[in-house]
Regions:
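A short, conserved alpha-helix in the catalytic core of glycosyltransferases
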Residues: 145, 156-182, 187, 217
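C-terminal, non-catalytic tails of nucleotide-sugar-dependent glycosyltransferases
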Residues: 199-220
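Conserved donor NDP-sugar-binding/catalytic core segment of glycosyltransferases
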Residues: 81, 86-119
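A recurrent flexible, glycine/aromatic-enriched loop bordering the glycosyltransferase active site
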Residues: 117-145
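Glycine-rich, basic loop-to-helix element that forms the pyrophosphate-binding segment
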Residues: 52-68
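Short beta-strand-to-loop acidic/aromatic patch adjacent to the donor-nucleotide binding site
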Residues: 69-83
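Active-site donor/metal-binding and catalytic loop motifs
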Residues: 180-202
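Short, acidic, metal-binding catalytic loop of nucleotide-sugar glycosyltransferases
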Residues: 18-30
Length: 220
C-alpha cells in the first residue's frame, strides 16, 4: 500500500538518513525525493534527488507537484531528524480520508539536547491568513488537491512565498485539518559537517520575503 510520495530537505547523507529510514520502514511510501541545492552531490539509497534553489519557492512547489504520483504528498520542512510515532502516517491518512481534508497536520514533540518538549499546533480557522501560522513540519496533502492548487498558483515566481501561496490556494477550496495528537518528533542532532550546503534560513523580517508574502496574501 504505497500511498505517499515524500519530499525531504537534504544537505547530505548524515543529516537525512534517519528521517529517510523511518519513512521507508512505514511501508506506506511510494517514492522519497530529496530536496537539495544544485551543488549537493550526495544521495541516499532508494531516493531520488531534486535540485532547486529554494525549498520555499514557487518553482520548488511546481517541481514537487510534477513528481507527486501517489495518492498523498508529504512535505517535511525541516533539516532536523524526523522520528514518526507508531502508525503516525496511517493515522494521518485515516483522518484525511474520514474528513475529506485537502491537508492534515498534527501536534509534535521537539527534542533538543536529549530534552523533549511538547510543541502543539492549533486548529486552522477559515481566514487564518498569517504567513507564520504554525502547522508543524509534516504536511500531508491529498495529491489531487496539491496539484490543483499548484496549477492555480500566482504566475509571479516567488522565492520565499511559494509554500505560503500553495497553502492559501488549498484553503480556498479544501479544509486544513489539525490532528490533535502527538504523532512525530523533530530531533535536533548536530550532524551537519562544516561546509554542508543547506537552503538559507530567511529571517521573517527580511524585506523581500515580507513583500512576497504580502503579494501572495493580496492575490488570495
Amino acid at each position: 500500500m504505497n500511498k505517499i510520495n515524500c519530499f525531504v530537505p537534504f544537505s547530505g547523507a548524515a543529516q537525512a538518513e534517519k528521517t529517510v529510514k523511518g519513512l521507508q520502514e512505514t511501508g506506506l511510501v511510494n517514492n522519497i525525493y530529496l530536496l537539495a541545492l544544485p551543488d549537493v552531490t550526495e544521495n541516499l539509497p532508494g531516493c531520488s534527488t531534486l535540485h532547486m534553489q529554494s525549498i520555499q519557492s514557487s518553482a520548488a512547489i511546481r517541481d514537487i507537484a510534477g513528481h507527486s504520483d501517489a495518492e498523498y504528498t508529504l512535505i517535511y520542512t525541516k533539516y532536523t531528524t524526523l522520528e514518526l510515532g507508531l502508525f503516525a502516517l496511517e493515522r494521518m491518512i485515516h483522518i484525511a480520508e474520514d474528513s475529506g481534508a485537502g491537508m492534515v497536520y498534527a501536534d509534535r514533540y521537539q527534542v533538543k539536547e536529549g530534552k523533549q518538549t511538547n510543541a502543539p499546533v492549533i486548529d486552522y480557522q477559515f481566514g487564518s491568513l498569517r504567513d507564520d501560522f504554525d502547522f508543524g513540519s509534516v504536511l500531508l496533502f491529498r495529491t489531487d488537491t496539491f496539484k490543483e492548487a499548484a496549477a492555480r498558483m500566482n504566475e509571479d515566481e516567488y522565492k520565499f512565498a511559494g509554500l505560503y501561496d500553495l497553502r492559501l490556494k488549498v484553503s480556498q477550496n479544501e479544509s486544513l485539518v489539525h490532528i490533535n495528537e502527538y504523532l512525530y518528533s523533530e530531533i535536533e542532532d548536530d550532524t551537519r559537517k562544516s561546509g554542508e550546503k543547506i537552503f538559507d534560513y530567511v529571517d521573517p523580517r527580511n524585506r523581500d520575503r515580507q513583500i512576497e508574502m504580502e503579494q501572495a496574501f493580496t492575490e488570495h
